[in-house]
């Protein structure tokens, strides 16, 4: 992402190169990947993780031992209220993972830089609307 995609975009388009103007956004496993990239690269100052697979084995202990690479990042987290209501031994942990991730990020960045939105429904409920809300939240200028 940071070695090929961003340099290619910057070479072909007149885009800003600052972290506060560079975002990564994903849904489900893509949400996990977006959050992972935010921990690994200071390039991303806008991060969206919607119904991200934070239950993935080893991710939460790893995240607890790290800080986001961009100290001024703004993060949008979103999860459906029904997502943790399952018998699946992995997926049932998702709500606790999100609550913990929100806590970690708020400690690192401050409450004004972290938005956690709980939506009615499950993993596949109103995905386009949820994505739009996340993008609107991240692209809105931060409150001073």
Regions found by a protein language model. Give the residues of each.
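Non-catalytic cap/lid and distal C-terminal segments of serine-dependent acyl enzymes
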Residues: 1-144
């Amino acid at each position: 992402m940071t070695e090929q995609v961003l340099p290619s975009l910057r070479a072909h388009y007149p885009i800003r190169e600052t972290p506060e103007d560079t975002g990564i956004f994903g849904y489900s496993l893509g949400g996990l990947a977006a959050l992972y990239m935010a921990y690994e690269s200071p390039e991303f100052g806008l991060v969206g993780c919607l119904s991200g697979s934070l239950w993935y084995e080893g991710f939460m202990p790893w995240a607890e031992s790290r800080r986001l690479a961009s100290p001024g990042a703004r993060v949008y987290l979103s999860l459906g209220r029904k997502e943790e209501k399952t018998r699946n031994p992995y997926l049932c942990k998702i709500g606790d993972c999100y609550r913990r991730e929100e806590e970690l990020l708020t400690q690192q960045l401050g409450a004004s830089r972290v938005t956690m939105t709980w939506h009615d429904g499950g993993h596949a409920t109103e995905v386009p609307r949820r994505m739009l809300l996340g993008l609107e939240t991240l692209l809105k200028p931060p409150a001073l």
